[in-house]
């Protein structure tokens, strides 16, 4: 340990220093100096490598003041040019294409669009797969260009808002339950057929059922009976000719015996009634029905 001596010197006084004065050099020498230089050189190399990697990443990713590559940052949001591939789910408030091009969503498996509430629960989902298109929602609706509902579906009912529902399949339309509609008709020059292969077919209307064929015939076929019944009104057959074909021809019985047979009589207004059969007509005797 070195002890330093301090001497007070006045002006004009000369003091000689001792010859054995010790001189100390301040600094880093030897292997410590070489290690420090090596460490600084290593830091400089790392800095150069980092700068080169940063420049390479900026060049590869196409970073620019307005965005990254085809992805541009605008005041309205993000604008993406060209085709892009998303490896993970995409969350966005609005997705739209340019004015002069269409929006294309494509996937090798399926495309799923989901809507969630504030709690994260799915409230609506559209899934486009290879075999089918699945829509999961409480209410599904398709509108026209002017906002008019064309088709809507709920758990209770399905509504078709077009002026006409057309089924072009060769087997027609199959309904497992009842159908409510104001009009059922076929295309021009085509047949209309209502069929129930294994059950009955019923048509009900509170104000009447109107069946009309403008350019053809109306045919009703049944393996059993065809019953035309009116509880309060009359059954009217309005035609120039009314024909009953394939009627059985009766055989002649004993004279003076009707055997419970009746003849059909007609009033001037077309009303039909029965009269006891006899050797001659008895319609005039029972014509008071026409009054």
From Swiss-Prot:
Transmembrane domains' residue ranges: 38-58
Principal subcellular localisation of the protein: membrane
Xref: InterPro entries: Sarcoglycan, Sarcoglycan_gamma/delta/zeta
Tissue specificity as recorded in UniProt: Most strongly expressed in skeletal and heart muscle. Also detected in proliferating myoblasts.
Record's signal peptide: none
Disulfide bonds: 265-290, 267-283
Membrane topology summary: Single-pass type II membrane protein
List of glycosylated residues: 110
GO biological process assignments: gene expression; membrane organization
Keywords: Cell membrane, Cytoplasm, Cytoskeleton, Disulfide bond, Glycoprotein, Membrane, Signal-anchor, Transmembrane, Transmembrane helix
Subcellular location, record wording: Cell membrane, Sarcolemma; Cytoplasm, Cytoskeleton
This protein's record includes keyword RNA-binding: no
Ranges per topology, Cytoplasmic: 1-37
Extracellular topological segments: 59-291
Job of this protein: Component of the sarcoglycan complex, a subcomplex of the dystrophin-glycoprotein complex which forms a link between the F-actin cytoskeleton and the extracellular matrix.
Classification via PANTHER family: GAMMA-SARCOGLYCAN (PTHR12939:SF4), SARCOGLYCAN (PTHR12939)
Subunit and interaction comment: Interacts with the syntrophin SNTA1 and FLNC. Cross-link to form 2 major subcomplexes: one consisting of SGCB, SGCD and SGCG and the other consisting of SGCB and SGCD. The association between SGCB and SGCG is particularly strong while SGCA is loosely associated with the other sarcoglycans.
Family (UniProt): Belongs to the sarcoglycan beta/delta/gamma/zeta family.
Name this polypeptide is given: Gamma-sarcoglycan
Species: Mus musculus
């Amino acid at each position: 340990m070195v002890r330093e001596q301090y001497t007070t010197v006045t002006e004009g006084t000369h003091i000689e220093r001792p010859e054995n004065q010790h001189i100390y050099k301040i600094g880093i020498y030897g292997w410590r100096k070489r290690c420090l230089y090596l460490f600084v050189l290593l830091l400089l190399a790392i800095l150069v490598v980092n700068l080169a990697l940063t420049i390479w990443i900026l060049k590869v990713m196409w970073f620019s003041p307005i965005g990254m590559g085809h992805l541009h940052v605008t005041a309205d949001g993000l604008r993406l040019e060209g085709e892009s591939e998303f490896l993970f789910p995409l969350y966005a408030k609005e997705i739209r294409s340019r004015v002069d091009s269409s929006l294309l969503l494509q996937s090798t498996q399926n495309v799923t669009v989901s809507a969630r509430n504030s709690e994260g629960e799915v409230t609506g989902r559209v899934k486009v797969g290879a075999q089918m298109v699945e829509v999961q929602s409480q209410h599904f609706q398709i509108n026209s260009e002017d906002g008019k509902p064309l088709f809507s579906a709920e758990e209770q009912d399905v509504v078709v808002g077009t002026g006409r529902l057309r089924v072009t399949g060769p087997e027609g339309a199959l309904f497992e339950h009842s159908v409510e509609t104001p009009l059922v008709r076929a295309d021009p020059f085509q047949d209309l057929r209502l069929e129930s292969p294994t059950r009955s077919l019923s048509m009900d209307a509170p104000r009447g059922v109107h069946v009309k064929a403008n350019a053809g015939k109306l045919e009703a076929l049944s393996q059993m009976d065809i019953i035309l019944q009116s509880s309060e009104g009359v059954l009217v057959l309005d035609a120039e000719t009314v024909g009953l074909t394939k009627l059985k021809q009766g055989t002649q019985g004993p004279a003076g015996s009707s055997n419970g047979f009746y003849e059909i009589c007609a009033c001037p207004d077309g009303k039909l009634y029965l009269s006891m059969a006899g050797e001659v007509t008895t319609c005039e005797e029972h014509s008071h029905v026409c009054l």
